From Swiss-Prot:
EC numbers, comma separated: 2.1.2.9
Catalytic activity: L-methionyl-tRNA(fMet) + (6R)-10-formyltetrahydrofolate = N-formyl-L-methionyl-tRNA(fMet) + (6S)-5,6,7,8-tetrahydrofolate + H(+)
Primary gene name: fmt
Tree of life domain: Bacteria
Pfam families tied to this protein: Formyl_trans_C, Formyl_trans_N
Family: Belongs to the Fmt family.
NCBIfam families listed in its UniProt record: fmt
Enzyme class: transferase
Organism: Nitrosospira multiformis (strain ATCC 25196 / NCIMB 11849 / C 71)
Annotated residues for binding of (6S)-5,6,7,8-tetrahydrofolate: S109, L110, L111, P112
Protein name: Methionyl-tRNA formyltransferase
Alphabetical keyword list: Protein biosynthesis, Transferase
Length: 312
């Protein structure tokens, strides 16, 4: 197939490479403009841009898809289909009708559950046991189009948003290759979504990243995994602001108040929560490196009954 591909992060780059390796013609790649990133805030290219340059694909980085000139460029490509994966820009309805077979999206959830911007993180936060990839035909709505193909995977107890992004990136790559092959063979039947079963995955807000120790330890543990690697859950104790990167739940009941340190153990700092306790295993002081709690405590004095501040 002759394809226009639109995507930005590594999740999308995996799909682009798989499509090219499967023999499809990548006629044009769209990705977001370079943006400041890292400590130096220097302009950085997206994973999709780097791959497109490496493979010699035609590349455009428009700030918006609403310009008439861009529509003319897309029409001139005469693509069979447009594949969209974590692009980050809204596709106007007029663009959806440009390719012969329209536009399909690689969405990182089991639609109609978790439509929207942060399906991977919201699945972890909700304690979902499985997630997956949905290949869907794009329409006017937000992830509302007919389903072409679905594949699921189990969410492991130690999965973070980062590890799940990697797993789903590989699954998404395999799924889009499979879906296009079935489409070419006329073996796909588009299935409408059940709107009554839809849930929405709103983007993560910074206000959600402050630990509220009044919550159940299990819920905080999920939040730590969902916010890893970005933006990272954080809390403050004895004036020390730290991010918490890895935790586990201690189901023993405690009499301490939420946020109060119950014990300092070889496996981590045990903190009381609204229910049960949380073991902080890997932490990072503001401006410092990620450290196992035992290493962190070599340079910072924390004791039982010291209390973390609680976000609300």
């Amino acid at each position: 197939m002759r394809i226009i591909f639109a995507g930005t992060p590594p999740f999308a780059a995996a799909a682009l490479e798989a499509l090219a390796d499967a023999g499809h013609e990548i006629a044009l790649v769209l990705t977001q403009p370079d943006r400041p990133a890292g400590r130096g805030m220097k302009n950085a290219s997206s994973a999709v841009k780097l791959l497109a340059q490496k493979r010699g694909f035609g590349l455009l980085q428009p700030p918006s898809l609403r310009q008439p000139e861009l529509h003319m460029q897309l029409e001139a490509v005469r693509a069979d289909i447009m594949v969209v994966a974590a692009y980050g820009l809204i596709l106007p309805f007029s663009v959806l009708n440009i390719p012969k077979l329209g536009c399909v999206n690689i969405h990182a959830s089991l639609l109609p559950r978790w439509r929207g911007a942060a399906p991977i993180e919201r699945a972890i936060l909700a304690g979902d046991r499985e997630t997956g990839i949905t290949i869907m035909q794009m329409d006017r709505g937000l992830d509302t189009g007919p389903i072409l193909l679905v594949r699921s995977i189990t969410i492991a107890k130690d999965d973070t948003a980062g590890t799940l992004h990697e797993k789903l990136g590989q699954l998404g790559a395999a799924c889009i290759v499979e879906a296009l092959a079935l489409l070419q063979q006329g073996k796909i039947i588009a299935t409408p979504q059940n709107d009554l079963a839809a849930t929405y995955a709103s983007k993560l807000e910074k206000t959600e990243a402050e630990i509220d120790w009044r919550m159940d330890a299990e819920n905080i543990d999920r939040a730590v995994r969902a916010f890893n690697p970005r933006p990272g859950m954080h809390s403050t104790v004895n004036g020390i602001s730290m991010k918490v990167w890895q935790t586990s739940v201690d189901i023993a009941e405690t009499d301490e108040k939420p946020g109060e340190i119950v014990a300092i153990r070889p496996d981590g700092i045990v903190v009381a929560c609204g229910k049960h306790a949380l073991i902080l295993k890997i932490v990072q002081k503001s401006g410092g490196k990620k450290l196992r709690s035992a290493e962190f405590l070599l340079g910072h004095s924390l004791h039982p009954h010291d209390r973390f501040e609680s976000g609300e």
